Amino acid sequence: PHDNWDFIAAGAMDELTTQKNRSALDALGLRPRFLRDITERSISTSVLGTPISLPVMICPTGGHGIAHPNAECETARGAGMSDTLMMCSTSSNNSLEEIAAAATGPLWFQLYHRGYDLTEMLVKRAEEAGYKAIALTVDVPSPSPKERDLKNHYSRELELGNFRGLDKDREEISGTDETPGWQVSRVAPLTWKELDWLRGLTSLPLVLKGLRTGEDAKMAVECG
């Protein structure tokens, strides 16, 4: 349906940042070089020790159930067929264990901080399920509604698979606009103090998703 497509394609608010990103990418060009021997060639690389066949990864988004009945499990299969990395969202419709069971390629787990207890639970489950890294989202302190969704009166509350069976209010486990029916999460703020705590929870590589300044990137490196 059209409203599902708008949910997938739309950027936050009036999509100004999306437009700027598109313009920046359109401004890039390739400088082809010729008369080279390309008999042996490879575009494979690795990211934090995870080998992939090409420098393209699947970034975390929730709510894949609006596009396929098998939701994120099917996305993971597609990533495996391309021999590349998939980052699975906290807001996935399938549980992280279900996605890991379906995957044939490497997985990272994207984490929203939902307070100490829920965050620790998710990190430990990701470790046990074989995920290769934790990617903590730091640039979504509260949901940013999409104007297209508001215009369409879009609301479709799909299951949050990672919290199935937990006795928690939706506002405790939501707080992202990646899944239809989002609500603002009422949890403690995320600061560098929480990052130190999180770093001590796991030996997996820890990535901060959404940093915008060199100063913050330097602080992240210092935190490990």
Language-model segment annotations:
Residues 56-59, 84-88, 107-111, 134, ...:
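Hydrophobic faces of well-ordered beta-strands that scaffold small-molecule active sites
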Residues 92-93, 111-115, 140:
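Short, acidic/turn-prone active-site loops that include or flank metal/cofactor-
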Residues 52-91, 96:
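Glycine-rich active-site/cofactor-binding loop and its immediate structural neighborhood
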Residues 2, 11, 15-19, 69, ...:
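Electropositive phosphate-/nucleotide-binding environments in soluble metabolic enzymes
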Residues 10, 64, 68, 88-89, ...:
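Glycine- and other small-residue-rich loops at beta-strand/loop junctions that grip anionic moieties
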Residues 102-111, 116:
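Long, hydrophobic, well-ordered secondary-structure blocks that form the structural core
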Residues 63, 76-77, 81, 98-102, ...:
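Alpha/beta enzyme core
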Residues 2-52, 146, 153-190:
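An N-cap/entry alpha-helix motif that binds or orients negatively charged groups
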